Amino acid sequence: MADISDQNIPGHVTTGPIRGSRKIYVEGKNGVRVAMREIDLEPSANEQPVRVYDCSGPYTDPNIKIDIAAGLKPLRREWILARGDVESYEGREIKPEDNGQLGPDRSGGVPPFPNVNHHPLRAKAGANVTQMHYAKKGIVTSEMEYIAIRENCGRAQMKEAMIRDGESFGANIPDFITPEFVRDEIAEGRAVIAANINHPEAEPMIIGRNFLVKINANIGNSAVASDVAAEVEKMVWAIRWGADTVMDLSTGRNIHDTREWILRNSPVPIGTVPIYQALEKVNGIAENLTWEVFRDTLIEQAEQGVDYFTIHAGVRLAYIPLTANRITGIVSRGGSIMAKWCLAHHQENFLYTHFEDICEILKRYDIAFSLGDGLRPGCIADANDRAQFAELETLGELTKIAWKHDVQVMIEGPGHVPMHKIKPNMDKELVACHEAPFYTLGPLTTDIAPGYDHITSAIGAAMIGWYGTAMLCYVTPKEHLGLPDRDDVKVGVVTYKLAAHAADLAKGHPTAHFRDNALSRARFEFRWKDQFNLSLDPDTAESFHDQTLPAEGAKAAHFCSMCGPKFCSMKITQEVREFAAQGMEEMSDQFKEKGGEIYLPAAE
């Protein structure tokens, strides 16, 4: 067995508080304890700390010792067991092909996670353990309690500052989130709690258009680059900067073991595209895929704790010819795999024909569907075509089938869409897919900016998030060019946090503006450190400031390098206010000298 040090598994990952912030915990019922982040302001501000949503997990709590070889504390395990509807069992044996045809001695692979649980949980016979099932029965789970506190994020403290001036396009965002509201949104299928019973380390979160807009970050090894140390750190790094979920899109060797390391150390939901690993098991030959291989892969990943699966069940045989005249054809990896299988066998997609079988598996572990858009447009010229919308209609049909089994569903969306075609995508999804949460990749609004596609896509992401998309899948500067590294992940996450927040502001989320206004006051009052700390990326903000004004004293200066001390507009405005205030005092004195009468007698 390979030694950890030999395989470059990190003994540590990025930890410690985000600068200017501290981890706090808000207590709820039944032992619920919700992590949040507070940004402390300078005493001169005379303001309360700014409380913000936090998905960085224990990694930013200095009081918690992180040992990735031990994994995180199983936060939800007691809640799961207390419901009395699960059982442990002897899990499937790990096979060489699970790790990409590695030999039995694991030579050339990464070390397995220490003390792997070979007795996963599943629903007892006849039971259904999904959050949707509980919600339909009127049950408020501990997960729902946790989410309500988390989504409110101190709204009660900000009650006086609430502003509802946005355009929500029909979304129903209450002033305060209650556990019962969370339950009802889950029961109606308008929101998803992605929380596999075998991933108890995950902190409950919700994806739905009546909640904060969430973002996902993609990580993963590939056939040409595979380093589990980098993948674990990418996950930690992504959630540090605000990724609400992470998808492991590994396509190379060591897939199973890499995923185990990530899951055991992830406080956020983990999603996968199971067809990628299934393809590895048949040596990359799409035609050799079978339902049996795919089913085995689903169970393998379910036992590990994957929280949501992208399933390309909407790529039907009849739709494939509709892509023939596209500029870029089928750009989805999963979509192209299934299209090739359908054409090779001239049969209907086995993910479609076995969809109810997939539902039976998912409801035993509470895994959510992320119904894949395998026919999404790969360029703006292909946007909103017959192939794309035919698949979307099918995803709506499959959503109804999943809900019949009380399996949670979200719908994946494009892609590449010019700005004027974005809203029709959202409107059509709400109708065709019965208001199931929309989860979109961007969309990219132009195709001319390789190297800057985090920007081209953030434009579309902000717009579609405003219109109602529940979760945005990030795009990094490396999109279409190569695999993102650690720095690319940060840029992608911060860019998409910006897009999601802009959408929350536009939707009229009651306290979304609170952080903006706190930063604006800090900017006007030249509280530089508060400006840095309130930003989405404090390190970069301070670094840019210090490139021209590196002296520590410059952080107390009432100007910046752009205007200089003589031409700072905000400094001049402050002086104008002082002069105006002084003038008002003089007029007040004159008023008092003349007896304080409102109406003076007319002069004779």
Curated annotation (Swiss-Prot):
Its cofactor is [4Fe-4S] cluster. GO terms for cellular component: cytosol. It comes from the Bacteria. Zn(2+) binds at residues 416, 480. Keywords: 4Fe-4S, Iron, Iron-sulfur, Lyase, Metal-binding, S-adenosyl-L-methionine, Thiamine biosynthesis, Zinc. Substrate binds at residues 218, 247, 276, 312, 332-334, 373-376, 412, 439. GO terms for biological process: thiamine biosynthetic process; thiamine diphosphate biosynthetic process. It catalyses: 5-amino-1-(5-phospho-beta-D-ribosyl)imidazole + S-adenosyl-L-methionine = 4-amino-2-methyl-5-(phosphooxymethyl)pyrimidine + CO + 5'-deoxyadenosine + formate + L-methionine + 3 H(+). Its EC number is 4.1.99.17. The keyword Acetylation does not apply. InterPro entries: ThiC (IPR037509), ThiC-associated_dom (IPR025747), ThiC/Bza_core_dom (IPR038521), ThiC/BzaA/B (IPR002817). GO terms for molecular function: 4 iron, 4 sulfur cluster binding; carbon-carbon lyase activity; zinc ion binding. Binds 1 [4Fe-4S] cluster per subunit. The cluster is coordinated with 3 cysteines and an exchangeable S-adenosyl-L-methionine. [4Fe-4S] cluster binds at residues 560, 563, 568. Pathway: Cofactor biosynthesis; thiamine diphosphate biosynthesis. Homodimer. Catalyzes the synthesis of the hydroxymethylpyrimidine phosphate (HMP-P) moiety of thiamine from aminoimidazole ribotide (AIR) in a radical S-adenosyl-L-methionine (SAM)-dependent reaction. Belongs to the ThiC family. HAMAP family: ThiC (MF_00089). This is Phosphomethylpyrimidine synthase. The lineage of its organism: Bacteria, Pseudomonadati, Pseudomonadota, Alphaproteobacteria, Sphingomonadales. The gene is thiC.
